[in-house]
Amino acid sequence: MSSSLQSNRQSLNRKVAVMGYPHVGKSALVLRFTQNIFPERYESTIEDQHSKHIAAFHRDYHLRVTDTAGQQEYTVFPRSCSLDINGFILVYAIDDRKSFEMCSNIYEKIVRTYGDTSIPIVIVGNKTDLSTQRVVRAEEGEELARQWDAKFVEITARESNRVHEVFELLLREIEISRGNLSPTERPNGNSPKRNPFKDDGKPCSIS
């Protein structure tokens, strides 16, 4: 494709939301993806909107990301997540059992709001850099993903490449759900020779 055609190629708009219990690293995940920074100090998020242009699957995307405020119980589903969201990232911390359990509550709210169990979801077990404090096994995240027909990965938001892979995985699921992409296609247009979501030699399913 010529450079003139590439410059005139229109970006496809997609909206995603990042949800989870307080203190699990949602904002760190979003800031690492959109600005390539990692906040060392925790600051409570009310709600932030971010965006990033990315190229994947031979297309250009304008990805709008809603960084939601963490709730203790999620008795009220965020209004910003009730309309026009194409996919969700549900984040828990591997050192926080309550945050993992809260993912089920959030999932139920998503299904109830959208009336659809097939909406693209990626479950993220964050803070693998705190592996010595782990209380949630990777197998538990994998099982939850199987139950929901979702995707599951474990990462640390400190690693930029891994964070980008999470958002590309969700984007891939969104495009598959819209009939725009083959399930075997990856961001570079090739089928992978290895599982791209392995952390320090430990298996992490994409189920």
Swiss-Prot record:
<feature type="compositionally biased region" description="Basic and acidic residues">
    <location>
        <begin position="196"/>
        <end position="207"/>
    </location>
</feature>
<dbReference type="Pfam" id="PF00071">
    <property type="entry name" value="Ras"/>
</dbReference>
<feature type="binding site">
    <location>
        <position position="45"/>
    </location>
    <ligand>
        <name>GTP</name>
    </ligand>
</feature>
<keyword id="KW-0636">Prenylation</keyword>
<dbReference type="InterPro" id="IPR027417">
    <property type="entry name" value="P-loop_NTPase"/>
</dbReference>
<dbReference type="InterPro" id="IPR020849">
    <property type="entry name" value="Small_GTPase_Ras-type"/>
</dbReference>
<protein>
    <recommendedName>
        <fullName>GTP-binding protein Rheb homolog 1</fullName>
        <ecNumber>3.6.5.-</ecNumber>
    </recommendedName>
</protein>
<feature type="short sequence motif" description="Effector region">
    <location>
        <begin position="42"/>
        <end position="50"/>
    </location>
</feature>
<dbReference type="GO" id="GO:0019003">
    <property type="term" value="F:GDP binding"/>
</dbReference>
<dbReference type="GO" id="GO:0007264">
    <property type="term" value="P:small GTPase-mediated signal transduction"/>
</dbReference>
<feature type="binding site">
    <location>
        <position position="25"/>
    </location>
    <ligand>
        <name>GTP</name>
    </ligand>
</feature>
<keyword id="KW-0547">Nucleotide-binding</keyword>
<feature type="binding site">
    <location>
        <position position="126"/>
    </location>
    <ligand>
        <name>GTP</name>
    </ligand>
</feature>
<feature type="binding site">
    <location>
        <position position="157"/>
    </location>
    <ligand>
        <name>GTP</name>
    </ligand>
</feature>
<dbReference type="InterPro" id="IPR001806">
    <property type="entry name" value="Small_GTPase"/>
</dbReference>
<feature type="modified residue" description="Cysteine methyl ester">
    <location>
        <position position="204"/>
    </location>
</feature>
<keyword id="KW-0342">GTP-binding</keyword>
<keyword id="KW-0449">Lipoprotein</keyword>
<feature type="binding site">
    <location>
        <position position="26"/>
    </location>
    <ligand>
        <name>GTP</name>
    </ligand>
</feature>
<dbReference type="GO" id="GO:0005525">
    <property type="term" value="F:GTP binding"/>
</dbReference>
<keyword id="KW-0378">Hydrolase</keyword>
<feature type="region of interest" description="Disordered">
    <location>
        <begin position="180"/>
        <end position="207"/>
    </location>
</feature>
<feature type="binding site">
    <location>
        <position position="27"/>
    </location>
    <ligand>
        <name>GTP</name>
    </ligand>
</feature>
<feature type="binding site">
    <location>
        <position position="42"/>
    </location>
    <ligand>
        <name>GTP</name>
    </ligand>
</feature>
<dbReference type="GO" id="GO:0005886">
    <property type="term" value="C:plasma membrane"/>
</dbReference>
<feature type="compositionally biased region" description="Polar residues">
    <location>
        <begin position="180"/>
        <end position="193"/>
    </location>
</feature>
<dbReference type="InterPro" id="IPR005225">
    <property type="entry name" value="Small_GTP-bd"/>
</dbReference>
<keyword id="KW-0460">Magnesium</keyword>
<feature type="lipid moiety-binding region" description="S-farnesyl cysteine">
    <location>
        <position position="204"/>
    </location>
</feature>
<feature type="propeptide" description="Removed in mature form">
    <location>
        <begin position="205"/>
        <end position="207"/>
    </location>
</feature>
<dbReference type="GO" id="GO:0046872">
    <property type="term" value="F:metal ion binding"/>
</dbReference>
<keyword id="KW-0479">Metal-binding</keyword>
<keyword id="KW-0472">Membrane</keyword>
<feature type="binding site">
    <location>
        <position position="129"/>
    </location>
    <ligand>
        <name>GTP</name>
    </ligand>
</feature>
<comment type="similarity">
    <text>Belongs to the small GTPase superfamily. Rheb family.</text>
</comment>
<dbReference type="GO" id="GO:0032008">
    <property type="term" value="P:positive regulation of TOR signaling"/>
</dbReference>
<dbReference type="GO" id="GO:0003924">
    <property type="term" value="F:GTPase activity"/>
</dbReference>
<feature type="binding site">
    <location>
        <position position="45"/>
    </location>
    <ligand>
        <name>Mg(2+)</name>
    </ligand>
</feature>
<feature type="binding site">
    <location>
        <position position="27"/>
    </location>
    <ligand>
        <name>Mg(2+)</name>
    </ligand>
</feature>
<keyword id="KW-0488">Methylation</keyword>
<keyword id="KW-1003">Cell membrane</keyword>
<comment type="function">
    <text>Binds GTP and exhibits intrinsic GTPase activity.</text>
</comment>
